[in-house]
Each structure stands twice: as C-alpha cells, then as structure tokens.
C-alpha cells in the first residue's frame, strides 16, 4: 500500500471529533431564493449613478470603509444551502462564513481543504481574495 493509499484509507475511516462545533441545518433552496429576492429589491432601490456597498453588521476588513454609500441587503445570504455527503459538496451563499460551513459539513465527516485563520471570513470574501493572507 502506498503512502497516498494509506492516507486515503485513514481519511475515509476518520470520524469527526467535536471541538466547538455547533451543527447547523442547511437553509435550503427556498430560503436561498428569498435572500436573492431581498438582495435584488435592495439593489433596485439604489438610485441610478450611486455607489453601493454591502450592508452587513460585521466585517473582517482591517481598514475603515465609508457608510455613506447605499447598502445592499445581503442579510438573507449567509447560510449553507445544502450539503451532499455522497458527492462531498456543499452549496453555500456568498455571505456564509467558514465557521458555518464547517459546522454544517462536519456532521457528514466533511470540511473544506483550507480554512482561513479568521473563522468568520465569508466564502464570498475569500473567493474574491480577501481571505488570503500574505
């Protein structure tokens, strides 16, 4: 058995161990669509030519940001939509934090390959490059 085969076998047999995980239920596609509709409504309410920002309560930015711009309501897009343990995939919303993703996937013996240092970084933020450390 090769080292890689050995590792694959050990990973397949591994059982998740609780640390501070709080298992959460995925929100589902209907709730996701409600969040998308809420976001679209807030976008359509922004006057033409105005700059926009994400209106959210928390941030992992380590610089100030202007509150003068119109805010897009992303409050309905912060969850895990669905976990498929057979395909080993998860559908998530853009404002989903890595903390919530791990809490939703660990009960299935899954987790992301990479988790940023700040567990409240959103997947959307990490994908756009904000979660990458230099």
Mark where each language-model region is.
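Noncatalytic alpha-helical scaffold of FAD-dependent oxidoreductases
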Residues: 1-134
């Amino acid at each position: 058995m090769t080292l890689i085969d050995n590792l694959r076998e050990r990973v397949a047999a591994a059982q998740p161990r609780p640390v501070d995980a709080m298992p959460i239920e995925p929100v589902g596609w209907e709730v996701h669509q409600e969040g998308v509709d809420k976001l679209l409504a807030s976008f359509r309410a922004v006057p033409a030519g105005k700059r926009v920002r994400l209106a959210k309560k928390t941030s992992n930015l380590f610089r100030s940001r202007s509150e003068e711009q119109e805010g897009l309501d992303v409050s309905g897009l912060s969850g895990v939509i669905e976990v498929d343990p057979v395909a080993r995939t998860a559908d998530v919303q853009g404002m989903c934090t890595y903390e919530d993703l791990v809490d939703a996937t660990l009960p299935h013996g899954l987790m992301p390959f990479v988790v940023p240092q700040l567990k409240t970084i959103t997947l959307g933020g990490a994908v756009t490059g904000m979660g990458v450390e230099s």
